Amino acid sequence: MLDANKLQQAVDQAYTQFHSLNGGQNADYIPFLANVPGQLAAVAIVTSDGNVYSAGDSDYRFALESISKVCTLALALEDVGPQAVQDKVGADPTGLPFNSVIALELHGGKPLSPLVNAGAIATTSLINAENTEQRWQRILHIQQQLAGEQVALSDEVNQSEQTTNFHNRAIAWLLYSAGYLYCDAMEACDVYTRQCSTLINTIELATLGATLAAGGVNPLTHKRVLQANNVPYILAEMMMEGLYGRSGDWAYRVGLPGKSGVGGGILAVVPGVMGIAAFSPPLDEEGNSVRGQKMVASVAKQLGYNVFKG
């Protein structure tokens, strides 16, 4: 049994130590994100048996952004299976920025990873759907099943994203021309942009992690969301590419599958045990929350979790 006092102390200590850490800046290329108050910070644990521990601004709702890629990858694995995802999208780190097109050029147009923009757009196109709205509703539903029913599209974030997503539109057409997009290019880009524009809070983000930790069963609703045998593929991708250019450093120092988003959220999974999530808007140069990384790493270290430990 996990010690409730120890878990609450871990999040309290992480928050106290790092919530006012200086450094980083909000993403400024998406107008909505530039205006989120930079002093916000939160950290939370949700255990695989459904206990919740949090500190800071844990009710504040922020844009899910790239963490949505985990949810869409999960749905694609349910729809087409791990082999098809590997064949049609890839399962390798790119070693390049999340919005890079260089990896596409180097690998014949194949995006390599579902957790960078090119691969995520391709993954969105893999979802079984007859039209744009069905594709979008299925992705929204999996986000809600994994994290909580309150996860919803923000029209303000979506508008802010849709009017600035020219680079992603270009990526979508490159994928389409290379044969690695499986629906209309602008449909894939539209739905991908929407999936990044949902709002979530830190406890819900930790719930997403706890659902993965529990082998696909949401510990708060007790409903099976994913097949248990698909979860290791998701965690492997998170370990390889979840923090973009910081992924190797994160694996080396923290040793947990993770995923960040430019909205300031960051998630880590302790398989079989818990999800750990944090939020704070200022980002490092790779697009990861500066305080969020420190808070999640602190919780993991205090509790002694690292998947590479014997």
UniProtKB/Swiss-Prot annotation:
Modified residues (N6-acetyllysine): 294
Keyword Transmembrane helix: no
UniProt catalytic activity: L-glutamine + H2O = L-glutamate + NH4(+)
Keywords per UniProt: Acetylation, Hydrolase
Protein name stated in the entry: Glutaminase
Subunit structure: Homotetramer.
Protein family membership: Belongs to the glutaminase family.
Signal peptide: none
Originating organism: Escherichia coli O81 (strain ED1a)
Organism superkingdom: Bacteria
Entry-linked PANTHER family: GLUTAMINASE, GLUTAMINASE 1
